[in-house]
Design a protein with these regions (language model features):
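Helical scaffold of the NTase/Pol beta-like nucleotidyltransferase catalytic core
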Residues: 1-35, 65-66, 71
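Conserved NTP/Mg2+-binding pocket subregion across the NTase superfamily
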Residues: 2-8, 72-187, 194, 200
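Short helix-terminating capping/connector loops at secondary-structure junctions
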Residues: 28-30, 48, 79-82
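Catalytic metal-binding acidic patch
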Residues: 36-73, 83-90
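Short amphipathic alpha-helical segments
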Residues: 192, 196, 214-215
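CN hydrolase (nitrilase-like) catalytic-core segments centered on the catalytic cysteine
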Residues: 198-209
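Short, charged amphipathic alpha-helical segments flanked by flexible coils
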Residues: 208-217
Length: 217
């Protein structure tokens, strides 16, 4: 059973509200937008298996302590009930558009153990907190959010986010195919990773951004 934003269950809506509050509490007036993309924006969200994919845009850079504070709160909200995946971008890194875009915060299931060790002190340093880092995936996230995204907080995504050139988008969804390691992720991620590769091929043919499910049909 799939759903979109309008048909989300109360627990998932509460989780989304909690995530938005995490960012609003810490960024206040410097939070420009919180947007949903991914399967939810494409109407193929399956509770509680699908990730809640979010893109956050800030009006200033985030210092390390703020990133760690956000990470602690997001870690507690993760999988209650849905897995969370999000990237936070500084608006100054989006305008003018450059590829790969620079990311200043990222959280996903792949990095949850790293954050656990950062939060309990076993790990002292990590690029996720210590640097702004280039991320090839951002081009795909920005374009999907701009075209199909759901606004949770802020202005409509098409007013805030830049247009992503076709060449950058294509490189974003297919650039790592040759070196992609399906088994570098948790076993639960394997079907989704396979379908992500199929989605890239489907875009080449259809020139339309499809969900992983629809691309696999």
């Amino acid at each position: 059973h799939f759903c979109g934003f309008e048909t989300l269950s109360a627990p998932v809506r509460a989780q989304l509200a909690r995530v938005a509050d995490i960012w609003q509490t810490r960024l206040a007036g410097d939070l420009l937008g919180v947007y949903l993309h991914g399967s939810l924006a494409l109407g193929r969200f399956a509770e509680p298996v699908s990730d809640l994919d979010l893109l956050i845009v800030t009006g200033r850079r985030m210092p390390r302590r703020e990133r760690l504070s956000v990470a602690a709160a997001v870690f507690e909200a993760d999988r209650k009930p849905c897995p969370l995946e999000m990237s936070a971008l500084y608006i100054g890194d989006l305008r003018p558009w450059r590829h790969p875009a620079v990311c200043q915060f990222h959280y996903s299931g792949m990095w949850s153990d790293t954050y656990r060790r950062l939060l309990d002190g076993r790990l002292k340093d990590c690029f996720l907190l210590d640097t702004d880092f280039p991320d090839d995936d951002i081009a795909c996230h920005v374009r999907l959010t701009r075209e199909r995204g759901v606004c949770v907080f802020g202005c409509p995504p098409a007013k805030l986010l830049p247009a992503v050139p076709e060449t950058d988008f294509w490189q974003s969804i297919c650039g790592g195919v040759g070196t992609f390691d399906l088994y570098a992720y948790a076993p639960r991620c394997l079907p989704g990773n396979l379908l992500a590769l199929v989605r890239g091929l489907s875009y080449k043919v259809e020139k339309t951004i499809l969900s992983k499910y629809d691309a696999g049909l």
